[in-house]
Amino acid sequence: MRHYEIVFLVHPDQSEQVPQMIERYRGMIESDGGHFHRLEDWGRRQLAYPIKKAHKAHYVLMNIECSSVALAELEDAFRFNDAVLRHLILARDEAVTSPSFLARDETDRRERSEETAEGEGEPDHSANEAVVTA
């Protein structure tokens, strides 16, 4: 079995259907003996240019290991699903399990917001104070 990295974009009106779509694709891959190594739901994001009159799309990233038969079935599912605006399938040499840069940015933002929420109280204005010398 080979390793693949897959990104697909779902029409924003169908964002509620993304978890069911992921489960359907997971079933297709695992029924053929494949494995998921990474699954990231990046949520709605702005597109660089409109696709089918949509300016936003729901992004999903998957790193999988599957046979060519399961991959062909998955690609057909993407092609015939009108909710999938675009998809990209890349062959990888090995399984990628580390978080993507978008997922890392999101966790960094969450950690920073938690730190500021814990440290609320008197704001520290020492950096804003001007030093006056006579």
Curated annotation (Swiss-Prot):
One Gene Ontology MF term: structural constituent of ribosome
PANTHER family according to UniProt: MITOCHONDRIAL 28S RIBOSOMAL PROTEIN S6 (PTHR21011), SMALL RIBOSOMAL SUBUNIT PROTEIN BS6M (PTHR21011:SF1)
InterPro entries: Ribosomal_bS6, Ribosomal_bS6_CS, Ribosomal_bS6_sf, Ribosomal_S6_plastid/chlpt, Transl_elong_EF1B/ribsomal_bS6
One Pfam short name: Ribosomal_S6
Family the entry assigns: Belongs to the bacterial ribosomal protein bS6 family.
Record-given protein name: Small ribosomal subunit protein bS6
Name of the coding gene: rpsF
GO biological process, one term: translation
CDD domains documented for this protein: bS6 (cd00473)
Record NCBIfam families: S6 (TIGR00166)
Matching HAMAP family: Ribosomal_bS6
Purpose: Binds together with bS18 to 16S ribosomal RNA.
Top-level taxon of the source organism: Bacteria
Basic and acidic residues composition-biased segments: 103-115
Region (Disordered): 100-134
Annotated keywords: Ribonucleoprotein, Ribosomal protein, RNA-binding, rRNA-binding
CC annotations in GO: cytosolic small ribosomal subunit
